[in-house]
């Protein structure tokens, strides 16, 4: 029986790796947020999502974060976003999710 559990666990891990690889091909960056043994997967939000979040949220950073997180979620138990402590934890990581490449601008 233990052998069967190991095989199904291995299959689940392989399935998860394949799904993540598919997401990376489609979206580029993929992030995993793990809390209490549960995982949530996010893509880096695109400009349309960030623009819409700015319009909807205006001066409310929590609404902004909620919109971006819900619209960037790829997989996992979405009901975790309703847990305030999970939401607050993710909100503290928004800069990482919405990271930018910084280059150098030269006056020629």
Short names for language-model regions:
Residues 12-13, 17, 32, 77-78:
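Alpha-helical interaction segments
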Residues 23, 32-33:
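A general structural signal for short secondary-structure junctions and capping/turn motifs
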Residues 1-24:
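Short, basic/low-complexity N-terminal boundary segments at the transition from targeting/disordered tails
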Residues 2-3, 27, 34-108:
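Short, surface-exposed, charged amphipathic helix/loop patches that serve as local interaction elements
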């Amino acid at each position: 029986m233990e052998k069967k559990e190991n095989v199904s666990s291995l299959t689940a891990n392989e399935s998860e790796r394949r799904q993540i690889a598919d997401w990376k091909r489609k979206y580029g960056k993929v992030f995993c947020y793990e809390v209490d043994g549960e995982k949530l997967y996010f893509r880096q939000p695109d400009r349309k999502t960030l623009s819409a979040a700015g319009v909807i949220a205006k001066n409310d950073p929590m609404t902004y974060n909620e919109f971006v997180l819900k619209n960037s979620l790829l997989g996992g138990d979405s009901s975790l976003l309703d847990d305030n402590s999970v939401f607050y934890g993710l909100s503290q990581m928004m800069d990482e999710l919405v990271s930018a490449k910084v280059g150098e601008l030269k006056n020629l």
